[in-house]
Amino acid sequence: ITEVCNFKCGYCLPNGYMADKSDNRKFLHIDEIRRLAKGFSELGVQKIRLTGGEPTVRKDFFEIVKILKNETSIKKVVITTNGYHLDQKAKLLIDSGLDGINISIDSLDRETFKNITKHDRLPEILKGIQILQDLGFVNLKINAVLLNGVNASTKDFNAWSDFIKKNKVNFRYIELMQTGDNLDYFNRYHISSKIFKSYLNDNGWIYQTQGLDAGPSLNYINPDYKGKFGIIAPYSKDFCKSCNRLRITSKGDLRLCLFGNTGISIRHLLQKDDQTEELKDLILGQMRFKKESHYLELGETGLTKNLSKTGG
């Protein structure tokens, strides 16, 4: 719902958010988002994830969530957030009706976290997670991008293991993905998630069979732990096999794949309430172009200049 982010993570926006001067379109208006959700819900979509950038920087963020929950047939509304104001907004997030919250925390080491994000906010974010748990919110996930020589050591893995032993949180490592403008960073820091998979196998974690509606994470459980571990490995052979996702950019472009080479604007069909049937027809017509796989392993990153553009 926005490309704006207040963090400066090295793998995404190392210099912070800078507006794209070649594209002067504004971000989707709340009414356009409502019409979009209505069309998708009538096509059978049951879950919407709000991403960015950082979605909570939008002044109408909570209003967007409430509209999706109360004025559409979408069953689950979830967000991915950096948690910058999590300690201050935890109750507001719950009261808005959100069904799930994914928080990006690349390290439990305060200095490492600061070096990656350029913000010293780890204590406040962890406090926010505790507040959410104290208020009874249970659908919490934490994502970390796996970075060679930064947060991919046994010490890092043990720290997260200790964390989820006491906290009912799903923690997932995401393999660093190459985008259009991070090739040097990718070459320096990419490491296969197999290193974490080996750690899990060596420490008694058991692979959990996925349901039909599951996401891309390979999940592992241990009866001695409250939380779960997960791996998101976009370079693995069967990563795209069960893909059930479509993406809409903050400016109204439909993307069939995070790393696809094509995208079309559907914004012209979000201007009036009576355009729903046209919108649905256009979306269904595009589905036949959804490919079986991305081509990341060949270095083809498609239209994704950085992940804030497509909601990675």
Outline where the language-model segments fall.
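A short acidic, helix-capping loop that chelates divalent metal ions and anchors anionic groups
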Residues: 18-23, 109-116, 180-184, 265-267
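Auxiliary Fe-S-binding modules of radical SAM enzymes
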Residues: 159-166, 176-312
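Residues that scaffold the ATP/ADP-binding catalytic core of kinase and kinase-like folds
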Residues: 8, 12, 58, 111, ...
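Residue-level recognition of short loop/turn positions
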Residues: 8, 52, 251-252
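Canonical Radical SAM [4Fe-4S] cluster-binding loop centered on the CxxxCxxC motif
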Residues: 2-30, 258
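Glycine-centered loop/turn positions within well-structured domains
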Residues: 7, 110-111, 238, 264
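Radical SAM/AdoMet-radical enzyme domain recognition
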Residues: 27-50, 54-172
